[in-house]
């Protein structure tokens, strides 16, 4: 029904783009720019001219196989097939545009059905005279939804799909962002809709947010009480483990950035919440001999949790 409604419009592209932007804004995602493929049409001839090509079977081929591709690619179709540039030509024009805009890392984010593009894009980079190692390709897997313990069957061909807005309606923006960021690009993403909507410790995003809110409550009750980073003569094991975990945060963020692995952040946040809850269960913060230091410790924990949640676009509530 959705596609039928769109097809009946005079300018379906504008309508679809507006719908996408509205959904993404709700999902806390903002693109700096939107570029239509047609904007590269004028650059096609220059891109093709920059490549080593040859004619075969009435088509124009580009030599990408010497640069790591598994075969050469048709870049201009034969007259029998319309004689127009193939999609490889658009890829070449876009790749050149990335380089001309001054970027040294050319990152592509593709879907699970685009594994064949890895060799193709790297081969194109080499054929254009660029180092293929500058091309980074992240292949993200499909999202599987579970409802009442059963997988939701989805098929684009049959029109059986779940739109992002429907997922946000069911579990909220925070949970959706958490679960979509919680897996690496090479791992299938499975979202248990029932669990993601729960307000319990079994739901990891709730569990981490609750740790933040719990600390906020402690700090509110502390009022203007003194805070000191000076540790007591002897640290409890739970204090020591929590401090060590907090000290890991800069390294976790740096590694997540370098490896294009944001999933490391929520995984780390769960460990921080685990360590905090363990510490809080075993030790009083207020009205304890180490109150000033423990207030500093829980405040540091709150800051790290808030920063981790912010990095994956999840809110850090003060109350729950």
Locations of the language-model features?
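Non-catalytic interaction-recognition regions
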Residues: 1-320
